[in-house]
From Swiss-Prot:
Pfam families: Amidohydro_3 (PF07969). This is Imidazolonepropionase. Catalyzes the hydrolytic cleavage of the carbon-nitrogen bond in imidazolone-5-propanoate to yield N-formimidoyl-L-glutamate. It is the third step in the universal histidine degradation pathway. It comes from Roseobacter denitrificans (strain ATCC 33942 / OCh 114). The lineage of its organism: Bacteria, Pseudomonadati, Pseudomonadota, Alphaproteobacteria, Rhodobacterales. HAMAP family: HutI. It catalyses: 4-imidazolone-5-propanoate + H2O = N-formimidoyl-L-glutamate.
């Protein structure tokens, strides 16, 4: 297939948009076979079925590399509590927060969880997402964690989107283990990880390293098992405080360290050395009305790749708009529109260990977005506006 009359944002490298005016893209199945100026299309592709894109902007398809779209229940009441002065930590310690979602998720059927998740996934797809990471972590027992991961796998069969799963058993201490996180890690989390891996449900292993969740020693035990199973790792780190999560992620060579509001310059250096991606999540920052901004300048200084995601979840980021996440990253964190677009494409792919996505180049996946926009900065600039004209998934319109 040949796409012509396009203004192509290749993102060939991280320095600029790599814009090709009057460009063309040839695909072969689900891969990009050639990209360049329309005048230079090789003869081998000129006889292909041609689609004139009308001079529209084409970018790599968007990737949401950090979501919790599978969950039961609703936590809108907590929104009111926080507006009345309760902190995220206070809500959690009072039995709300993640634990309230755990109760609802445990009680929901797979069918109900899938139906609810698909409403969120549909919103992401409508703004150009073709790859979504989905975490467990609202079960905190064997059966429900496995149930969540099975539902996550079913999303890819129910919708034209790819899904990568992350086992997040170390998300919170469930009520039945209150005050005894070590027993939970050893008796529930690690055995469940083994079971999920045996069932083929896990692509990566995640954890929440924070004062209200698990410390570095507890997370390390989970990561050691992940290593034995050959699974890559990710980590929620330095969202509400700094207890060494980012350094831990770097030591383990994690794919990503996520949130990272309280990361330091030394943490940024560690991420750069390990090649770990910093995933910033402005939806949670915004919803929780936080004031500590991720150290974007340090990430730039040390050439740490910055990814960006919705963090769609019921408590701290009920966000299903990647375009709004891009705007938030620019407005709240002072990222540039180029950084935001890279964060939702090439760097998001890196945060998932995907090497063939996020850029428009020969050999890459033919996942593309066609936009009614003049310049790529418009994607992060406008609010409440979806300029998506067409989403191309695996080379198919």
């Amino acid at each position: 297939m040949l796409f012509t009359n396009a203004r192509i944002v290749t993102l060939r490298d991280d320095q600029d948009y790599g814009l090709i005016e009057e460009g063309a893209i040839a695909t072969d199945g689900d891969q990009i076979a050639w990209v360049g100026p329309s005048a230079d299309v090789p003869d081998a592709y000129r006889s292909e079925t041609t689609h004139d894109l009308g001079g529209r902007l084409v970018t790599p398809a968007l990737i949401d590399c950090h979501t919790h779209v599978v969950f039961g229940g609703n936590r809108a009441t907590e929104f009111e509590l926080r507006l009345n002065g309760a902190s995220y930590e206070e809500v959690a310690r009072a039995g709300g927060g993640i634990v309230s979602t755990v109760t609802a998720t445990r009680g929901a059927s797979e069918a109900a969880l899938l139906a609810d998740a698909l409403t969120r996934v549909d919103a992401l797809i409508a703004e150009g997402v073709t790859l979504i990471e989905v975490k467990s972590g609202y079960g905190l027992d064997r059966d429900t964690e496995l149930k969540m991961l099975r539902v996550a796998r079913q999303i890819a069969s129910a919708r034209p989107v790819d899904v990568r799963t992350s086992f997040l058993g170390a998300h919170a201490v469930p009520p039945e283990f209150k005050g005894n996180p070590d027993a939970y890690i050893d008796d529930i989390c690690i055995p469940t990880l083994h079971a999920a891996h045996a069932e083929g449900l896990v692509d990566a292993v995640d954890g929440f390293c924070e004062g209200i969740a698990f410390d570095t020693a507890q997370i390390s035990r989970v990561f050691d098992v992940a290593g034995e199973l050959g699974l890559p790792i990710k980590l929620h780190a330095e969202q509400l405080s700094n207890i060494g999560g980012t350094q831990l992620a770097a030591r383990y060579g994690a794919l990503s360290a996520d949130h990272v509001e309280y990361a330091t310059d030394a943490d940024a250096q560690a991420l750069a050395k390990s090649g770990t991606v910093a995933v910033v999540l402005p939806g949670a920052f915004y919803t929780l009305r936080e004031t500590q901004v991720p150290p974007i300048a340090s990430f730039r200084k040390h050439a740490v790749r910055m990814a960006l995601a919705t963090d769609c979840n019921p408590g701290s980021s009920p966000l299903t708009s990647p375009l709004l996440a891009m705007n938030m990253a620019c407005t709240l964190f002072r990222m540039t529109p180029l950084e935001a677009l890279l964060g939702m494409t090439a760097h998001a792919a890196a945060a998932l260990g995907e090497q063939d996505r996020g850029r428009i180049m020969a050999g890459a996946r033919a996942d593309l977005c066609v936009w009614n926009a003049q310049h790529p900065s418009e994607l992060a600039y406008r609010i409440g506006f979806n300029p998506l004209h067409q989403r191309i998934f695996k080379g198919a319109i």
